């Protein structure tokens, strides 16, 4: 049986669907791991339901057709990651909608898939070693839950310490990855300490010109209010490097994914 449906490399692979297209394929293992939950996709920290997504198979593609047409062009710029001084750097993205369930997170996950594919194939074509973690997905809400877990009063050490280690590991991965998704940065209920850490991640990525896909429930012009920015400097720097896209339509949250 062909393994093509499980592999994000399939649409670019001449062996896809043939006799050599198995779970023992070296490129499949490098991308997805021997068990299908590892490799570079696993290292990206994508939630399990989003790990096989690309722009081609994304369930949000139909409802957000105009955005996806633009994204089909956008992901072609990922080849610039191999240029030392590209004339036009790869832009970051800011995806937002007022309501939930319009496909922002699904789309962001699909874009990570596209980046991993292009990084892996492009590295091989140039006789380079692909990075073990070229891209990283930070679920800001889940990250905040970890923060709360080790900052509550009287939390037992055996609970607080693993949560703290996981929290700071995710923070470092989100800073260091050449490409990252910061999912749902418009969190409204937070503490000064958590907000400071989120600012640190965003500021590090912006300062170092790292490609970032932000998803949010507020437009970029309103993000400063949500993040309680006293000066517009950080938001202005995000805007300078970002393409902003608004997702429209009704929520599909809770419906079975295609």
Give the label of every model feature segment.
Residues 59-62, 97-98, 146, 186-190:
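Surface-exposed cleft-lining segments at the edges of enzyme active sites
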Residues 48, 127-130, 233-240:
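Short, conserved catalytic or adaptor-binding loops enriched in Gly and charged residues
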Residues 90-94, 134-135, 179, 211:
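Residue-level preference for the first positions of well-ordered beta-strands
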Residues 1-80, 84, 243-245, 249, ...:
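A short, basic N-terminal segment
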Residues 86-109:
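Walker A/P-loop nucleotide-binding motif
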Residues 78-91, 123-129:
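Short helix/loop segment immediately N-terminal to the Walker
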Residues 67-72, 98, 102, 113-176:
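Short glycine-rich substrate-engagement loop in P-loop NTPases that contacts/grips substrate
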């Amino acid at each position: 049986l062909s393994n093509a449906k499980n592999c994000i490399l399939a649409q670019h692979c001449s062996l896809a669907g043939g006799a050599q297209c198995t779970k023992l394929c070296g490129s499949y293992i490098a991308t997805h791991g021997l068990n299908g939950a590892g490799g570079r996709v696993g290292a990206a920290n994508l939630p399990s339901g989003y790990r096989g997504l690309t722009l081609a198979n994304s369930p949000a593609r139909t409802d957000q057709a105009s955005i996806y047409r633009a994204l089909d062009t956008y992901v072609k710029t990922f080849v610039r990651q191999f240029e030392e001084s590209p004339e036009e750097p790869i832009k970051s993205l800011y995806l937002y909608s007022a309501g939930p369930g319009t496909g922002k997170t699904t789309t962001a996950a699909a874009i990570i898939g596209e980046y991993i594919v292009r990084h892996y194939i492009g590295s091989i074509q140039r006789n380079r070693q692909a990075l073990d973690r070229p891209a990283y997905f930070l679920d800001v809400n889940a990250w905040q839950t970890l923060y709360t877990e080790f900052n509550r009063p009287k939390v037992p050490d055996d609970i607080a310490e693993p949560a703290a280690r996981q929290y700071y590991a995710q923070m470092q991965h989100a800073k260091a990855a050449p490409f990252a998704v910061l999912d749902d940065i418009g969190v409204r209920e937070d503490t000064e300490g958590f907000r400071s850490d989120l600012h640190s991640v965003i500021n590090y990525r912006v300062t170092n010109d790292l490609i970032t896909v932000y998803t949010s429930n507020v437009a970029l012009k309103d993000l400063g209010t949500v993040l309680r920015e006293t000066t517009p400097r950080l938001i202005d720097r995000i805007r300078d490097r970002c393409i902003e896209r608004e997702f429209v339509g009704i929520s599909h949250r809770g419906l079975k994914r295609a």
